[in-house]
Amino acid sequence: MALLPDPTFYPSPGMAMQAPPERLAYVALLNVGNNGKRDAMGVVDLDPSSAEYGRLVGRVDFPRGDNELHHFGWNACSACLCPQTPHAHMERRYLIVPGIGSSRIHILDTKANPKQPKIVKVIEPEEFIKKTGYTSPHTIHCGPDGVYGSALGAANGDGPGGIFLMDANTFELKGQWEQDRGPQQLAYDFWWHLGHDAMVTSEWGTPNMVKDGLNAELLLAGKYGHKIHIWDLDKRHHLQEVDLGAEQQMVLELRPSHDPKKTYGFVGVVISLKDLSSSIWMWYREDDGKKGKWAVRKVIEIPAEPADPDKLPPLLKGFKAVPPLVSDINLSLDDRFLYVSCWGTGEFIQYDVSDPANPKKTGSVYVGGIVRRAAHPSKPKQELNGAPQMVEISRDGKRIYFTNSLYSPWDEQFYPDGVKSWMVKVDAHPKGGMTLDEKFFVEFDGLRAHQVRLEGGDASSDSYCFSDKK
């Protein structure tokens, strides 16, 4: 019998764009407060021909509700086809779900019944801290030689945060990834350029800096993250620190070009101390992407919006404005469209980044927002809070999904009336522009929706070792 790779693995991003449409979404659902409810993984029907389209069709409750589930990922993906570390026998089966609140990691098996995953392993915080030296695991990515994860801090809740490794078969923790971290202390997201043996990491804050909400004193002092770091992926050594400037606070989501030949990507900055704007920066390698130093340039700036102080939460009243608060970005597999979530204003923006140094705004929609409270077209009289936050793109780039909860302690500061959670879908137009799907509006009773993953893979789940460019 022939052994064939998992059919959801693709050598190149262009081939992945030809994949069948997704039918299910996995959504991290957070319990907030002492209401007796537990955290959960929800399963949403994405098949437009289904009678249950846009509904929660499955759910697995976690043993406890204090995890603050965050950016989960698959045990294996298209990176398993990379020739330097081939693992084509692997299958995309397990979801690795980190909790930054509890330092637990839950492993879910989706194979037997994709609509009803089963928890097959729980890594407790004591084991995680003992084996990695870190706490608050944040983001999971499947790599060519195992599962990689980021963590916000050390065992005492301060720095440094960093990267840890996990065996993709047994889910045993291997330990810290870094051999030489150089000056790096703060951590958040990470991604890589597999064709160039380069990893990029970003910065938010340590657990002690974020767990009780945004600390205005630390923010105004420029103490949150404002750098990206470049690493030798193979040797696990720090190579270069790139500082965006201390006024650029919270350098979060990283989205590299999907083409492994390229050496550029985009990173979002939550807020500028100068004017409350948010921004998107492009990182790139000088000397035509060969052996030069890495650099950054600001390519998008989104201004704050003036607002009536009476409509603002206490944290913002003195500023008389709503900052955009860019909290997530995502890049389509063809590297053409960048999507940006503005969690403050409620705007969700599409940019054409075919020329990555010169993005062009091609569309936007509004849902929620601190002041705007924009309704969904399915319920035009229902004001919504929260705003576009975690965003995921289908492999063909035609469908975009987003949820509205950021992080519980920060939800309470910016939306003190309590985030009522929802998930929406946007249809992208081939030449640019987008429209909210009026038939897709999912509400989550008593739980808050965060990260979304699409069955079979999506635009931020996989990385590729083969280019579509000849």
Can you say where each PLM-predicted feature lies in the sequence?
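Blade-level signature of beta-propeller repeat domains, shared across WD40, Kelch, NHL, RCC1
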Residues: S394-K470
